[in-house]
Amino acid sequence: MLLTAPGGTVVQPDGLLVTPSRHVLLEAKGMGRSAFQSEQLSREFACVVRDAGNARPLLLLITPTAPPVPVKGHGRLPVGAAVRLFLVPVLARTSGLNTPLHDLIARIPDTVAWITWNEVQAAVADAHFDAAALPVSVAGTVQRLRDDLLKAIDWHRRS
């Protein structure tokens, strides 16, 4: 859970991956007809840029289909437009982010990326890993995680 400001709006991404060089906020949309909330991408963009520090920020969207993305009350929008849609009011309520609006808007293409569930599934299914180079227990865990992810994507697609 992230906050735009102390006592401010709660931002609840589906995942957060942090390394010394990357700060990745994950937002995964289900296979059904789910839409992003109207301010959601603006909030998540503001939080990932603010919280990245010296790391490179990335807002990674996992979606059922390629953009444009559905935004509640606004139809389907290109990703950049969906981020910009409520960026001004979100920034007014976001503490600790003092970057000028035009600089933030310029950063959207390098900060926001998307991949579809089909592409995730294909990448995982096609990925090769050298099980012989890993301890047996680690190789087994990696294989189980891979298989479980593929099964979960299939299950959600059918649901």
Q: Could you describe each region identified by the protein language model?
A:
Residues M1-S159:
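Charged, terminal alpha-helix-loop-beta segments
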